[in-house]
């Protein structure tokens, strides 16, 4: 019997974990080990994947992977006897950073020079409050989300009040195994950059799972403190942790904190500075029983690889553990001789025979056994929190078998409706009136001052009309980001990945791929970067190539401008239709990519579903301000320069003479060279072609360019039909993304793939626009 056969609500004991490779190792690291109790919570609306409860936390995996895990006969967890461990409730006051010899290794401390910078790595599981702590420590305002893997790149900052420090916020990981790109980034930083100290943040509501990573970090021999985050939630729900006792068992300082409330931060910083300054390494790195087969195996291998580990820059204990697990990256860097490999293999096989487990399972079991002992003696588990109970009730509706998909469609439909037809549209109209009022005022002032006609035209027709036409759409963009931020911060984005995994798998993608693509509706740049959370290079590349097909917010001004001019009675419908066209084309391209560039199976789906929570007002406001500021910077930098340049090229010929007819201008000559390519699409006017070219710099420039070149919508309507306008919209939706997005693709995948994106999207856009023009002409 396997997990796949377990009904929802039933529990069983894991007997064997099948499979092989990095995925199996990842399962072991996540706690799916022999002897562990697993409970099936629910199946996704489409029947796949399945949500499990293991070691007091929730995990989702696919049925094809669940089929690899053999379990005992099912039972109801309520009927199983559970030992209720009670402990002394007297809690001693936690000592300060300079007190208590057992909390700091005084004997082996090795003080650094006073002028040496103290570098720290901030490491922890995904969604444990790491970025919140980073913001508190540094005073930064990095985006905080309620989705596993928000941090996809390292971020640096200086700890407030300590100018000679540098702390790096690393991507969230579950172990030091190289399963995903985030884990590789974090591991390489710790092993190669060698920070002076580690601040390991743990989710106190789930210490058991979080300590698995802590044990691997302690093997590195880097000075370390543990920040036990969310202790306020533990106390509220009746739980507690004997801090002094857990410090003795782990051999590193443990500080209870609440990053969200700023509690315990000063003490955490004091301990971190102290261990880094005096280079006090963890006092414990051996977590197996002295007489166990695993202990003999690891120490036997340590003696064999000592020289190789020193040469590769790896701590012996860490390297030995990874050799037993079969970590290919570590084995490659150790450069072992063939006879050494054979001796090591003999030692490991002997250990497997004595343990009755395979090598990777034995190491994972050793760690979890130690963790279980630590938690049994130091932790009183909190009762099920109100947040968890509330999340379960909400999930019955939002991830229910018959309600999950309809609710997703309804929620996204409501987001687009409110953005384009109610809130965003209303605010955009108000701002447009204000911009028009200011423009008319400046126009009258310049006229009264009898300013030179050329300069007058530049200021009004170029700058105010060009930049102002783009600024009026700022409310729509901010409104869209507001709703996307609410969905992410609340935890719903993770549910969307859970709901859509089976459907996306048919397209050759993982459910996690939907999150970068949903982010792409806001902006392609963070959407492309978010693909780093995917462990498979195949899935990652495919997701990066598909994300720009999702209509980013920078294209909203184009849709709104053309909809108001050509389809005033159906403006909202046309704008929403653009999003659906992008999705449909993305699906078609996914099928094509699956059969050509990206053959094979998508990455396995392994993810946590966080509790729902109320989005933090500060976080939402900060995100909106960042997006608005980014838009305004574009408006007054790229778009400002582009409008002046376009105005100049429209009003002067190649001899720099002022032209009476813009068809004789520099712009007309340049655009005229490629205009024939667009005539079959219904918009063969050089001014529209020019707008497309400027849109490569920033999509918002399309509207400002058209506003300058045509002067009025009446003129534009006279040279292009409604069918041509629809064709133009489809082309703008699908053609090459902006320079910033292309640069992000180049950064993630390299120049070759960035060139592919430009070429593929231009070809697809031309074909789609032609089909649109033909169909619209018939209708």
Residue ranges of model-derived segments:
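Core alpha-helical transmembrane segments of integral membrane proteins
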Residues: 398-498
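Transmembrane helix-loop junctions at the membrane interface of multipass transporters and ion channels
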Residues: 553-576, 740-750, 771-779
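Hydrophobic core segments of alpha-helical transmembrane domains in multi-pass membrane transport
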Residues: 407-418, 480-485, 563-565, 578-592, ...
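Extended, low-charge hydrophobic alpha-helical regions
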Residues: 354, 361-362, 381, 422-463, ...
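Conserved C-terminal guanine-recognition region of P-loop GTPase G domains, centered on the G4
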Residues: 162, 187-253, 558
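Alpha-helical transmembrane helix bundles of large polytopic membrane transport and channel proteins
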Residues: 225, 235-382
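Juxtamembrane inter-helical linkers in multi-pass membrane proteins
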Residues: 437-441, 494-524, 599-623, 667
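Conserved G1/Walker A P-loop phosphate-binding module
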Residues: 94-175
């Amino acid at each position: 019997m396997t997990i796949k056969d377990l009904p929802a609500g039933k529990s069983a004991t894991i007997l064997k974990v099948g499979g092989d490779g990095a995925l199996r190792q990842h399962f072991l690291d996540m706690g799916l080990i022999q002897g562990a109790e697993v409970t099936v919570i629910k199946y996704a609306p489409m029947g796949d994947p399945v949500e499990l409860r293991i070691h007091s936390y929730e995990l989702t995996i696919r049925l094809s992977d669940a089929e690899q895990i053999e379990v005992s006969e099912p039972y109801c967890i309520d009927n199983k006897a559970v030992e209720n461990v009670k402990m002394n409730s007297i809690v001693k006051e936690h000592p300060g950073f300079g007190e208590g010899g057992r909390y700091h290794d005084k004997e082996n401390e090795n003080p650094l020079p006073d002028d040496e910078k103290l570098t720290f790595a901030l490491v922890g599981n995904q969604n444990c409050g790491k970025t919140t702590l980073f913001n508190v420590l540094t005073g930064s305002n990095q985006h905080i989300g309620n989705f596993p893997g928000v941090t996809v790149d390292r971020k640096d900052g200086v700890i407030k009040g300590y100018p000679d420090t540098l702390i790096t916020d690393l991507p969230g990981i579950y172990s030091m195994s190289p399963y995903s790109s985030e884990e590789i980034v974090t591991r390489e930083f710790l092993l190669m950059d060698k920070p002076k100290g580690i601040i390991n943040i743990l989710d106190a509501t789930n210490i058991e799972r979080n300590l698995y990573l802590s044990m691997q970090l302690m093997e590195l021999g880097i000075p370390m403190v543990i920040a036990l985050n969310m202790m306020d939630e533990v106390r509220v729900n009746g739980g507690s942790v004997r801090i002094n006792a857990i410090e003795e068992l782990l051999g590193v300082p443990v500080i209870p904190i609440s990053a969200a409330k700023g509690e315990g931060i000063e003490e955490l910083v004091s301990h971190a500075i102290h261990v880094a300054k005096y280079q006090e390494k963890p006092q414990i790195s051996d977590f197996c029983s002295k007489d166990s087969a695993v202990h003999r195996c690891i120490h036997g291998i340590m003696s064999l690889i000592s020289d190789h580990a020193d040469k590769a820059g790896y701590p012996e204990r860490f390297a030995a553990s990874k050799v037993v697990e079969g970590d290919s990256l570590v084995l490659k860097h150790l450069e072992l001789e063939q006879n050494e490999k054979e001796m090591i293999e003999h030692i490991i096989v002997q250990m497997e025979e004595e343990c009755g487990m395979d090598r990777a399972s034995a190491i994972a079991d050793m760690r979890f056994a130690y963790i279980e002992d630590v938690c049994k003696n130091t932790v009183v588990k909190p009762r099920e929190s109100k947040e968890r109970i509330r999340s379960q009730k909400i999930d019955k509706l939002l991830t229910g078998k018959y309600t999950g998909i309809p609710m997703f469609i309804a929620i996204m439909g409501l987001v687009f409706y409110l953005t384009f037809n109610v809130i965003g549209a209303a605010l955009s109209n108000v701002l447009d009136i204000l911009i028009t009022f200011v423009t008319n005022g400046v126009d009258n002032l310049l006229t009264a001052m009898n300013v030179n006609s050329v300069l007058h035209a530049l200021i009004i027709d170029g700058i105010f009309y060009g930049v102002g036409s783009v600024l009026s759409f700022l409310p729509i963009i901010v409104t869209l980001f507001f709703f996307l931020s609410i969905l992410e911060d609340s935890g719903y984005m993770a549910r969307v990945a859970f709901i859509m995994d089976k459907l996306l798998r048919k397209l050759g993608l993982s459910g996690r791929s939907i999150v970068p693509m949903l982010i792409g509706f806001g902006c392609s740049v963070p959407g492309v970067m978010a693909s780093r959370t995917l462990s498979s290079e195949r899935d990652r590349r495919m997701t990066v190539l598909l994300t720009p097909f999702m209509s980013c917010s920078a294209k909203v001004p184009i849709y709104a401008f053309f909809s108001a001019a050509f389809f005033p009675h159906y403006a909202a419908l046309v704008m929403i239709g653009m999003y659906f066209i992008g999705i449909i084309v993305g699906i078609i391209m996914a099928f094509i990519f699956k059969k050509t560039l990206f053959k094979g199976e998508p990455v396995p789906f392994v993810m946590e579903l966080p509790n729902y929570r109320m989005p933090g007002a500060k976080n939402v406001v900060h995100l909106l301000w960042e997006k608005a500021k980014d838009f305004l910077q574009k408006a007054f930098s790229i778009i400002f320069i582009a409008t002046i340049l376009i105005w100049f090229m429209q009003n002067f010929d190649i001899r720099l003479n002022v032209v009476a007819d813009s068809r004789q201008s520099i712009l007309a000559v340049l655009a005229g060279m490629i205009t024939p390519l667009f005539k079959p699409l219904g918009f063969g006017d050089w001014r529209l072609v020019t707008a497309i070219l400027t849109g490569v710099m920033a999509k918002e420039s399309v509207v400002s360019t058209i506003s300058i070149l045509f002067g009025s919508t009446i003129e534009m309507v006279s040279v292009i039909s409604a069918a041509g306008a629809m064709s133009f919209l489809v082309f703008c939706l699908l053609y090459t993304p902006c320079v910033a997005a292309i640069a992000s693709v180049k950064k993630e995948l390299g120049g070759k793939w960035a060139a592919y994106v430009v070429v593929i999207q231009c070809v697809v856009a031309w074909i789609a626009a032609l089909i649109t023009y033909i169909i619209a002409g018939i209708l």
